Amino acid sequence: MATAAVIGLNTGKRLLSSSFYHSDVTEKFLSVNDHCSSQYHIASTKSGITAKKASNYSPSFPSSNRHTQSAKALKESVDVASTEKPWLPNGTDKELEEECYDDDDLISHSVEAILLLQKSMLEKSWNLSFEKAVSSEYPGKGTIRKKKIPVITCSGISARQRRIGAKKKTNMTHVKAVSDVSSGKQVRGYVKGVISEDVLSHVEVVRLSKKIKSGLRLDDHKSRLKDRLGCEPSDEQLAVSLKISRAELQAWLMECHLAREKLAMSNVRLVMSIAQRYDNLGAEMSDLVQGGLIGLLRGIEKFDSSKGFRISTYVYWWIRQGVSRALVDNSRTLRLPTHLHERLGLIRNAKLRLQEKGITPSIDRIAESLNMSQKKVRNATEAVSKVFSLDRDAFPSLNGLPGETHHSYIADTRLENNPWHGYDDLALKEEVSKLISATLGEREKEIIRLYYGLDKECLTWEDISKRIGLSRERVRQVGLVALEKLKHAARKRKMEAMILKN
């Protein structure tokens, strides 16, 4: 037999001699091979192997195609080897050669069984390796978990629609999370302290309210003690008047303070919700929140838990009052009274009602609908004029740098508002003062200063004569001569333009 046949049979020999199975076919195959090579006789035992046909063979391992290809390659190598002339050693007899050719038929019959046996052995070996791999992934378990095959079901909705829906849901969740975080930051920006997110029960509110009431009674007692003593009482004096120790007094004050803080912090979100309704009406959000917190503290002090009302229902109106007052005080550059703000609100609502009916909202119709005089309506509408600073930028700057202000587009015709005019007056006074000091004598200086009011006192010739002790005519003559001296000196110093102008 050819070398290729020997190689193929040797491969089958290795497979058959493995530790998986041992049968009489193995012994027979080995005896035949040894007989052909070393002149031993073939055993007459028949094979007892029963194997399935290749058509009925359906391996459960996923790589069954590779098994089939390996078996097919082995069979092809054996078929090619069977067509070639078998190899015999030198010096063999003719009988031995015929005996080897008779054994070829037996080998061809056993090849089919060998191939089927190889398939089953490879399947067992691969299944064993797979079991080892699975057992290593899931240690401590005696049984091997089978892989679950996903079952695809049709839901009636396309995959694209499911992806779009999942994306929208994710975006909505992200926006909600961002809004919660931003609202929390906004509240923390206006309020100092830890904001309570848990809703207090009515029993807890009643307990805290009683502590706050006891603190208010303590403040009243302290104010009465201050009136009797005439000064602010110390902690020792207050504790003695209450017949308690100083430590008990401090613990009492601390409990009242903590109760007020806890009850206020649990209602901060209510303040924010009310303040947001008055946003964009001219006042800053921080001012509205501060006004609402002042109203909240006032409502907590006034709350009576014995009447059975919820604290949020009671403090709502106090918070609203505080926010509205903050709006009145901070919404305009020029503050308007509270009653005027209320009147403006009534006028605004009356205008909306008239416009809905298709009526032009004039002053007389608004006054008639509100049962108010036309003068009050006119005064309120005239007070609504907006006030803005001329130092503001006329146009928004794109590069962030300050641009032209309203002063560049609005001219002021009044001379006293011109800054250069004041500078000119000051320079003229200094020049005239130097000219008088350098040109005139003492009497002439006094007469000129009193007559022209250079010392902020303007007198007549007669008043000057009474003060100096000269006649009126003599004072007038001295004054006129002094004025001529000043004109002559001014011409020399080239001050004619200033003298003629002024």
From Swiss-Prot:
Span of the annotated motif Polymerase core binding: 287-300
Knockout-associated phenotype: Lethal.
Any one Pfam family match given in the protein's UniProt record, by short name: Sigma70_r3
Gene Ontology molecular function terms on file: DNA binding; sigma factor activity
Compartments where located: Plastid, Chloroplast
Primary residence: plastid
Organelle transit peptide: 1-23
UniProt family annotation: Belongs to the sigma-70 factor family.
Listed name of the protein: RNA polymerase sigma factor sigA
Species: Arabidopsis thaliana
Gene responsible for this protein: SIGA
